[in-house]
């Protein structure tokens, strides 16, 4: 491959600031160091050329590495200074093999911005898969890992990048780093397989969580625009860095929001440039760093991992002298004056003041209060007696009470989750969501009930006490965002469609207020609706849970107002049948006889 081609591939993931207009390759080569440099190239190649093999890419990476060295020489080639997106596309399009193998002919017939959009759209259509498919036994993985650590991690990056073309490269590399840490720990254990199975499940959960957060942010940006994203990020980072001033935080949030559109579109060149600019500027502000311990620690990370570190920061201690509560009424004259001239600034200041005082709150609780406060200010600030008007308008709205009430709600959910087995709690969620949206498919409701269980299980376990609220509501809101985006809400029912079109912070409350759908016309409840046979005698808990949930789904759809007592009766009969037939000599014959009886008895119960 010619130098132009090598250079193009190399700078696909150039993470340089706009001010570094010259010799971009040398700067990233210096900052990321050789291994980080090669990893970034690998992610970019794998994400954009999914039908190429690792063998196809290895020579390109080696040549690109050599080009990086030349770009840092005393006489760097002119190609080091060219536009990165144009270079990458030109290089790929000059290779008939790459174009044909990765179906890029249509894109390569375009030029300039049209070609860039085509490349981004092409990547967006590549199927995604979050699973870790390297299902070799731990012993084999450990042998490969110990034999050549870098090669093993490289193969992981290649496979994961191909399956997740829209994930920002820094996220892919953070995931690869985590997977390497799992192997480093487990390969030194006597029971490597047990260690690996346990840690892999935890690691997979962490991946799903991070991807859900990124997906939700993109969905929110697409549906609600910059204003809501800015409000979310202002809450998030004000909670993390309460020592920073409102002006400092507002400036930082503006830069964060500027990265969302390119990162969500799949334009990773611009995404990484914007992120690099953001992190560089934030980490260069010694005034903020001296007061924000978490940020200061993250800024000591290498260029590849700083951004992920900042996103994962825990809240710093609150500044000395900060009042426990924020009273919007105490300075209402100044608030109204600012609101009249620049309403977004006034609302940003209010959100900031609440957020720095309440790291135990979710973003949604603060935004719900802010929405009420905004309505009060709109109504009152032009009035002569605006102070009294605002007091009256917000008389029933208290942020501290909202936080307490929501925290108590999740604590009760945690208690309910702890009081029963994991399977029974998941089944109860299946019942709840089938009642309010019986039109949804089993697969949809299975996913929803599983997600709610996973969120509460993780948050109740990992975030005890008052921090359960931001953990649980953030994750459940992410799940709602994904559900409303992945499926046509109007195809489920008008109530769900209405809630999906509510304001961002009100979606979950809206769904919780939905009553069982009594207008749904269910299919006939008969034996053909269920398949219950010897497969129920398996010891696989997942298969058993799935079977139990399918029965509940069918029964509750038939009567969304069925009582809990009737459900318990049906569940008892189901387990009695299962125990009887699994103990029978001819299991199939037993199920053939008993399953229709169970369905018939269940049908009679739902008529009551």
Swiss-Prot record:
Plasma. It comes from the Eukaryota. Glycans are attached at residue 501. The keyword Glycoprotein applies. Disulfide bonds join 26-72, 71-80, 93-108, 107-118, 142-187, 186-195, 218-264, 263-271, 283-299, 298-309, 336-381, 380-389, 414-460, 459-471, 484-500, 499-510, 537-582, 581-590. CDD domains: ALBUMIN (cd00015). Residues 19-205, 206-398, 402-600 form the Albumin domain. Residues 15-18 form a propeptide. SUPFAM superfamilies: Serum albumin-like. Residues 1-14 form the signal peptide. The keyword Signal applies. It is found in: Secreted. Belongs to the ALB/AFP/VDB family. Binds water, Ca(2+), Na(+), K(+), fatty acids, hormones, bilirubin and drugs. Its main function is the regulation of the colloidal osmotic pressure of blood. This is Albumin 2. It comes from Salmo salar (Atlantic salmon). The lineage of its organism: Eukaryota, Metazoa, Chordata, Craniata, Vertebrata. The gene is alb2.
